[in-house]
A protein has these predicted regions:
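Acyl-donor binding region in acyl/amide transferases
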Residues: 81-177, 181, 186, 190-194
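Intrinsically disordered, low-complexity, charge-dense segments enriched in Lys/Arg
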Residues: 2, 7, 11, 188-258
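Arginine residue identity/basic-tract feature
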Residues: 18, 23, 27, 48, ...
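Long, acidic/serine-threonine-rich intrinsically disordered regions with weak helical/coil propensity
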Residues: 1-106
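Residue-identity detector for threonine
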Residues: 5, 39, 67, 76-78, ...
């Protein structure tokens, strides 16, 4: 019987685990970088999937020894055996790098949740990036979603969950057909707060580069303001899900541009 959970897959021999997890690498990514057969290439396709654990981290590199993977994914099981995406990142290795993930001394920032490299964050924001991005993305989220849904289906599931780390992530997931398990009212309240007369709009006082008034009408700049602490609390308690092959048609930010 084929395993249906991350914990089940992690009990398999390593070659089988690699083959199963490699299914959610989008073909378009492999073709873009002309990657070789990856399941046996341990330097380009790296995993952390200890036997007995219920999570897996995958890194796909376009060349051996490069600083950042072109694809990073961290998956885990929910309490009832569903697949939960904790983090999914696509990096363009040819784009400039911004060290928002580490301090000048090399210590990690955990994407700005532990500490912040403000100089790198400001440079990233000016270059059009959103919070958490060290490089521009690859614009492959649509085929990546399709490949991931094929992987989910192969495990016998018809839905999966995601944890948006930032405000803009949640909005992007909305646009790709996700619905909210929890946090929709929070997202709607944030949108309302940025409207004319709203409390959050009033806090966009130009006191620092992350709080410019123009952020009120931009998903990306709102996300930077939220990352900067404009909510007076972390952006948490938002969980989303998607049913394979369907779109929930949810929007908590009507009329707001990227």
């Amino acid at each position: 019987m084929n395993p249906s959970t991350i914990g089940g897959i992690n009990k398999l021999p390593e070659a089988e685990k690699r083959a199963i997890y490699a299914r959610y690498i989008p073909r378009e990514l492999i073709e873009k970088f002309n990657l070789p057969e990856l399941t046996s290439h341990k330097e380009l396709l790296q995993f952390r999937f200890a036997e007995g654990s219920s999570d897996v981290e995958m890194r796909v590199y376009h060349q051996v020894g490069f600083t950042d993977p072109v694809l990073y994914a961290h998956l885990t099981d929910t309490m009832n055996g569903q697949i939960h995406v904790l983090l999914y990142i696509l990096n363009d290795p040819e784009a400039p790098r911004f060290d928002v993930d580490r301090m000048p001394d090399g210590s990690p920032t955990r994407f700005g949740t532990l500490k912040r490299n403000l100089e790198a964050e400001q440079a990233a924001m000016r270059s059009g990036l959103a919070p958490g991005q060290v490089r521009r993305g690859l614009r492959l989220l649509q085929p990546a979603t399709a490949a991931f849904e094929q992987f989910i289906t192969s495990l016998g599931h018809d839905m999966y969950f995601v944890e948006p780390l930032y405000y803009h992530n949640a909005v992007i997931f909305e646009r790709y057909g996700f619905a909210y398990q929890m946090g929709k009212r929070r997202m709607e309240a944030i949108h309302a707060g940025f409207q004319e007369g709203g409390e959050l709009r009033g806090r966009l006082d130009d006191s620092n580069p992350f709080r410019s008034p123009e952020a009120a009408n931009s998903i990306r700049l709102r996300s930077w303001a939220i990352h900067d602490g404009i909510l007076d609390e972390p952006f948490t308690d938002v969980t989303m899900y998607k049913r394979v092959g369907t779109s929930a048609n949810v929007s908590t930010t009507p009329g707001c541009e990227w």
